[in-house]
Amino acid sequence: MDRRSFVKRAGWAGIAAGFSSTAAFADTVEEAKAGAHTDAQATTKTASPETLLLKDYRPKSIYKIPVTEIAKAKFPVIDMHSHPYAKTEAEIDDWVRNMDEVGIEKTMILTMSTGAAFDEIQRKYAKYPERFEMWCGFDFTGYDKPGFGPGAVKELERCKQAGARGVGEIHDKGQGLRSGKLKAPGMHPDDPRMDAVWEKCGELGMPVSLHVADPIWMYQKMDRYNDGLMNAYEWRLDNQPGIVGLSGMVDILERTTARHRNTTFIACHLANLDYDLARLGEVLERNPNLYADISARYAETAPIPRFAAQFYGKYAERLVYGTDMGFDKPMYGITFRILESLDEHFYEVDQFSYHWALNGLGLSDEALKKVYLENAAELLARRKG
């Protein structure tokens, strides 16, 4: 799960770089959002150009150019990366209404959970079996003891019987695997202890949503040269010596997919190679059982629209749509605007935390159909049971 979505909703100002924020003490997302907005307004009203902080920078484009509002996707969509954001029946009903209005046919709920926690989420969403799919996590209990594996496999099989259709989101940002609150420090996806679990996923026909590393800016020095500093600081990894770096985690991802060709893997967030799409293309070419979801990496690719559009065109059959940013309609709309329009130099501070301007990629209808729906539909149709 990309927790930055919650930071975006709570208000960026004051969270990054250790600054205090009304959002940190708010009882609800709405209160946090309103409070942070008020704080930012007060700061910017009193700040001079010499004292204005980068975190309070809220530029507005001066260009008189077309602005495209896209309320509904051009083609039907399957969202391959979301989480159980809706906690009540009423919220789930609202989510379905939003999906209807924006053109989302089905959403994958990556619960990251096992046991009773998974069962409870499954029950909550059972009202809409055609609109939501539950994906479970892994049970890493005893991972550091001899004989790990059979227990995790048994719980995976139980979750499948309870309604799980896939696995995710499984994390490894360099310190070891994590599935929700369950952690396995030092055990990475290519560890032999995981072989039986990955093989069972393939045997059960359960695709795996695997999140490796984090964006490149989190690994760089937090200084004036860091292009993504506004978003990087809160999630920084440069101060954690000994972790596997971004490139090393991508190597681990490749070794894992190569060893388990009968298992389908989905690399979350473009495998965090949004800054090096050429390498991601090479990884996809070498691994036919690997897809990449584009969730929560819209702001990272929108600054390079021509190169990103070329990448989407070349690898359209290996990319799947995802959000990972809640379920409100404006959130869906900004993803559609980036993918479909040719808009230039616009800002989006409600969903993203970067300072730079965004651009539409203007993807072809052929690419949109594949990324929005066809790839996911084909991937899901290949499953067993």
What are these regions (language model features)?
Residues 44, 61, 88-89, 96, ...:
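H/E-rich (His + Asp/Glu) clusters that bind or coordinate divalent metals
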